[in-house]
Curated annotation (Swiss-Prot):
Name the record gives this protein: Trans-cinnamate 4-monooxygenase
Coiled coil, from the record: none
UniProt keyword terms in alphabetical order: Heme, Iron, Membrane, Metal-binding, Monooxygenase, Oxidoreductase, Transmembrane, Transmembrane helix
Location, primary (coarse class): membrane
Broad enzyme group: oxidoreductase
Organism: Vigna radiata var. radiata (Mung bean)
Membrane topology annotation: Single-pass membrane protein
Keyword Iron: yes
Keyword Iron-sulfur assigned: no
Entry-linked InterPro entries: Cyt_P450, Cyt_P450_CS, Cyt_P450_E_grp-I, Cyt_P450_sf
Length: 505
């Protein structure tokens, strides 16, 4: 059976080579394509650049080929944009033309081939899903409704760290407790639910399944089969695991959370007065026939990945930078004590009074961008960009990390220096008002979660710094900030141990 598969694959490679050469010649005459390394038949540039298309590797290619370049990865065209002007073209000026999402063999599994909001193609389904999700998740009213819960969760983290006898001596991996906090923050909004402890069996199952989903989706291991369809049979085992994880996750979401809200029956109100949490609004849209049950479950899938994990990564990066820059940590602490008073715990409304804390959040998102390439875009039809022809269904990556770390545009960008947002970059905000700084993207497909992420980051980092002196573990002068990149993610490689010495008030 393996021999037969090999023979079919080799025959397919030969036929694909012939087709690729013919198509390449025809396209070369038709299109003025962006520059890039010379592709070879079938494989394109895959053998030259490999699977690991992280932001730093793509930055090196941009230095060689320019602010826009093309990689032919098997049968897929991948266009990388690395300048503010071109980013503006993709995300704003031609936001409709480049407003779709690329397909991918693994993401197709986890999103039901685009039945969600984040990864669906641009069109009526996306507009409907965005509208349905905005009211229960992404408004100032939601922030005001749930900010007391976020403050309570941050207070619980502080209490648990204080009670931990190891925290002030040998340290603890604080990410584990912060992960529970983030699940509770979002599950309060989604389901009016929270988990009492890290040992909760349901939380353990949920965390494990979401972690496996992220690992499978963000891995570069499957690129060869995605780029080169005739090699896809070799992905059979990988894709089988993806399908099993997807089915198990969706069943868990349905059985333990969605069905519970249906049973509570709070969506029976015709004037929406009985709607208590986000999923009630989503289920109300299902009852009206606007979406189906699968759409409901894929919305839950989006929030589990896009809201929980990315914010957690940013909190972890912020803690790491504060530990490694004690003078900055002390400035945050001094500001909180001076403005709010010693012992007054940071609340969401207080953040506006704490500009240095806000600058620390912005600098964390600049230097350690959780989604450094943003979520990939796609043009459904042939398009123009930077004077070049972009073939239909090209994958467009905006290297947002390089936009925010290019020394041609930023002063000493490699330094963690929040002061830049008081000095030369005082006008720059995280909402995309400057195309050099796009931690949440901008335009039609920007991340609506910015309205939740910024206050949660401010509350969490503020509470930790005002209650503890955060230090590296004994024997270390700093904690390791090596990066772990994914398909379009960036998180810390090692979940660091942090010493948290309580302050006395």
């Amino acid at each position: 059976m393996d021999l037969l598969l090999l023979e079919k694959t080799l025959l397919g490679l030969f036929l694909a080579a012939v087709v690729a050469i013919v198509v390449s010649k025809l396209r070369g005459k038709r299109f003025k394509l962006p520059p890039g390394p010379l592709p070879v038949p079938i494989f394109g540039n895959w053998l030259q650049v490999g699977d690991d298309l992280n932001h730093r590797n793509l930055t090196q290619l941009a230095k060689r080929f320019g602010d826009i370049f093309l990689l032919r990865m098997g049968q897929r065209n991948l266009v990388v944009v690395s300048s503010p002007d071109l980013a503006k073209e993709v995300l704003h000026t031609q936001g409709v033309e480049f407003g779709s999402r690329t397909r991918n063999v693994v993401f197709d599994i986890f999103t039901g081939e685009g039945q969600d909001m984040v990864f669906t193609v641009y069109g009526e389904h996306w507009r409907k899903m965005r509208r349905i999700m905005t009211v229960p998740f992404f408004t100032n009213k939601v922030v005001q409704q749930y900010r007391h819960g976020w403050e309570a969760e941050a207070a619980a983290v502080v209490d648990d760290v204080r009670k931990n006898p190891d925290a002030a001596v040998s340290g603890l991996v604080i990410r584990r407790r912060l992960q529970l906090m983030m699940y509770n923050n979002m599950y309060r909004i989604m389901f009016d639910r929270r988990f009492e402890s890290e040992e909760d069996p349901l939380f353990q199952r949920l965390k494990a399944l979401n972690g496996e989903r992220s690992r499978l989706a963000q891995s570069f291991e499957y690129n060869y089969g995605d780029f080169i369809p005739i090699l896809r049979p070799f992905l059979k085992g990988y894709l089988k695991i993806c399908k099993e994880v997807k089915e198990t996750r969706l069943k868990l979401f349905k059985d333990y959370f969605v069905d519970e809200r249906k049973n509570i029956g709070s969506t029976k109100s015709t004037n929406n007065e009985g709607l208590k949490c986000a999923i009630d609004h989503i289920l109300d849209a299902e009852k009206k026939g606007e979406i189906n049950e699968d759409n409901v479950l894929y919305i839950v899938e989006n929030i589990n990945v896009a809201a929980i994990e990315t914010t957690l990564w940013s909190i972890e990066w912020g803690i790491a930078e504060l530990v490694n820059h004690p003078e900055i940590q002390q400035k945050v602490r001094d500001e909180i004590d001076r403005v709010l008073g010693v012992g007054h715990q940071v609340t969401e409304p207080d953040i506006q009074k704490l500009p240095y804390l806000q600058a620390v959040v912005k600098e964390t998102l600049r230097l350690r961008m959780a989604i450094p390439l943003l979520v990939p875009h796609m043009n459904l039809h042939d398009a123009k960009l930077g004077g070049y022809d972009i073939p239909a269904e090209s994958k467009i990556l905006v290297n947002a990390w390089w936009l925010a770390n290019n020394p041609a545009h930023w002063k000493k960008p490699e330094e963690f220096r929040p002061e830049r947002f008081f000095e030369e970059e005082s006008h720059v905000e995280a909402n995309g008002n400057d195309f050099r700084y796009l931690p949440f993207g901008v335009g039609r497909r920007s991340c609506p979660g910015i309205i939740l992420a910024l206050p949660i980051l401010g509350i969490t980092l503020g509470r930790l710094v005002q209650n503890f002196e955060l230090l590296p573990p004994p024997g270390q002068s700093q904690i390791d900030t090596s990066e772990k990149g994914g398909q379009f993610s960036l998180h810390i490689l090692k979940h660091s141990t942090v010493v948290a010495k309580p302050r006395s008030f």
